Amino acid sequence: LLRFPGGTVIKTFHWKDGIGPKEQRKAKKNLIWGGINPYHFGTCEFIEYCRELNCEPVLVINISTGTPDEAANWVEYCNGTENTYYANLRRSHGYPEPFNVKYWALGNEEAAEPDAGRHQNPHKYVEDVWHFIKLMKLTDPSIKLIANGESGNKEWTKTALKGLDGAIDYISYHAYVGTNGPSPYSIFQKIQGQDTWMREFAEMVKATVPDTVQNWKKWYRFPHRTAPVKIALDEWGIWEQQEPPYGTTNTYEWRHGLATACFLNAILHNAEHIGMANWAQMVNILAPIMTNSQTSV
């Protein structure tokens, strides 16, 4: 699986800015991480890249500054098969067949106050997200949805789970580890802690929502989930606080490679409950791949 356009950046991302001829796309300031986003890598480029890697795409919806209509139109653009505006728009861009994007995430870290999120109140998140879910699911009932979870706030997550049960298939969990103090080995203790925390998070999910849906309003014109809610570990990685202002430029050393292997082992240890896992980030932010206009390393 590969996740696009990423995490916090989704707060100001609008998918229509990244379709059509590249020379006609409008460059915009990246309000989250700085710099300029020319939108040259948009939906179609991402799908092509996923096909090249032979992986499933995961698209993240902007529920902060976006709208339910915008989200549903993105689903139609990607998966539409009928003679409709956005399906035809995709065809006009050179893609006659649908992309069949299966996984869609309902925002990212929406309770994070420093970011552009506005859902510190989980009840507000549930209320707002339902409008997105309905239009998206009515556009394509087959899609699988990932709701926000707050790995450090179980009560927030419980409220989201209870409020969205039946409609969602995954609950997200984000986990980063780094060195704590002078000892370079402290990172491994943190991974051990994440192993335990993932198990406890999974137990909380199972205790909050039953494996099978118990109550589903018949007037919903789309099906409820048919499997237990699983964890989407859609951000995990190594985060060493370094360069200001965001501390998001990592210099990886041997211990980070070993730590990554240990983290993967912890994920496998909890594989019964984890339905997907995505390394974060991939390019330029906390990334193993760094680029500029001339090269990449």
For the regions a protein language model found, what residue spans apply to each?
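Conserved, mostly hydrophobic/aromatic
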Residues: 2, 50, 74, 104, ...
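Aromatic- and acid-rich polysaccharide-binding/catalytic face
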Residues: 96-116, 148-149, 157-195, 229, ...
